[in-house]
Amino acid sequence: MSTTTFATETTTTATTRSTKRTVSYVISGLVGLFLAVDSISHLLNVQTAQDWNEKYGAPEWFSYPLGISLGIALIVHLIPRTAVLGAVLITGYLGGAIAVNIYLDDQAVFGSVFAFAMAVLVWRGLWLRDDRVKALYTR
């Protein structure tokens, strides 16, 4: 192998890594933004949260723990050292959302598919930038 070939392969590999990292930040940023808005809307107890609570008989305070738990999970996910734990917590939160949507038959298909897609994107963004997550899939 010539020096030129080796240099080209190294440059291509570095460019691919850079592109994957950029894509991972875009995916994680968009998902994080959506989840942050969801968390804040629960914490501010916006009208849609109040309407949902009233429709299904949930207590008025119900949206606050949801906003707090999602906010904590999101913060843990955004810290690189604890990102995997955050992804697990967010997946659990979204799994609960799926279960509630199916149980209450409220947006059972759209709501569940959307929550599932969010969970997949959380892990996909993490997989692109974290070798620990890649190692889980390659063993």
In which residue ranges do the predicted regions lie?
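Structural signature of hydrophobic alpha-helical transmembrane segments
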Residues: W52-L66, G111-F116
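Short hydrophobic/aromatic segments of transmembrane alpha-helices and their interfaces
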Residues: G32, V46, L66-I68, F116
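Charged, amphipathic alpha-helical interaction segments
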Residues: L44, A58, A97-V100
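Short juxtamembrane and helix-loop transition motifs at transmembrane-helix boundaries
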Residues: L43-K55, L70-R81
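Extended, low-polarity transmembrane helix blocks
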Residues: S2-V37, I79-R139
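Core segments of alpha-helical transmembrane spans in multipass integral membrane proteins
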Residues: V37, A58-V76, T91-G92
